[in-house]
């Protein structure tokens, strides 16, 4: 059992921000002044917040791209028919937010503002320019249209104005002035009984992270961002909500199942875990207080692994040494990964077996209960694995979700075996070779050579035009 202590250093780290910011709490929770334009250029705030700015800039050191599809080609099959089957990399530093959404194969290779596969909403977690545009055009104006429309406007990487009321006098004096810069996030927090302006400072610290590190979907004709929390934040609650409104992100091209794609539900999984339940915030673990060269405390904005700052993070509460805690976390991660792979194997078979049933003439009515099981199994699997830190945030909940996903996938396959038998198919359905990402993509009919060539042309021709236009309009520093 993990032992927890509340030592003097932990108390000191918690009390400093409390006493430091109590005097400005009322101003900090006030809404940004409507008459002041959101400033999206992060370097503008370096003079007032030099340590925070330089540590934020250091997220550019987190530059490695890890290809999740190459590590686990099963994902290609599970996301067949969806852009994630083309390209899915693990997350890296905030300094790459705009670059990565521009360069991923998922956003396509649009030639003009009305072209491309994805909506404007795909910019929503990438840049303080989003807050600027929402303030300028309203939410309807911002969300309207295709992703490419935002190219010349959304050019600054995730930064200051995403989490701080940078227009406030207190921010100019060096205070943090936290805010929810996305109105849809504020509405979601209110829906779960957490209005931002009434929340305590520690709650607010995690809520600003929860604007983006969260599950969401694109709602209505305008494809506006909405969090599916109306019925609650657990996986079953969100599943019920999506089913009730008959929402699907896409239809799997093999099984023809209307699917749900989880995003990055760190806020939900953190809330369900031991740290969230004890109000140990995102900031405590990922952005600890550290000292600069003069000995002044500041919040480290090089967001990263808590083990990289062990003395300022884990050691504030835990008595175990770093190696002991790393061993615990590694074991939890391995347990979750082992069950994850088992669920994926079941789902891969279910998608191909469903395709075989459809090819054999199965009707919509015959397929409906099977597709429901596939949909629910993959949703629960996805919500567990899309939160990359679930082995740390909520390992028990991760295993529980994966366990229910396994049950649902097994139910689907049992029903498929019976249905296939009625169609005269009693042999095992053959699965093509999907041992590599490339073979899996070929199995679902993707022309990756063409997709990559089109993307490279887009990167070479369209992105430079966007940046040139942004500089002319004063949106990027020269």
From Swiss-Prot:
General function of this protein: Catalyzes the reduction of nitrite to ammonia, consuming six electrons in the process.
Binding site for heme c 3: 94, 209, 212-213
Organism: Escherichia coli O9:H4 (strain HS)
Residues binding Ca(2+): 215-216, 261, 263
Origin organism lineage: Bacteria, Pseudomonadati, Pseudomonadota, Gammaproteobacteria, Enterobacterales
Amino acids binding heme: 122, 125-126
Name under which the protein is recorded: Cytochrome c-552
Keywords per UniProt: Calcium, Electron transport, Heme, Iron, Metal-binding, Oxidoreductase, Periplasm, Signal, Transport
Compartment list: Periplasm
Chain residues that bind substrate: 216, 264
Protein EC: 1.7.2.2
Highest taxon listed in the record's lineage: Bacteria
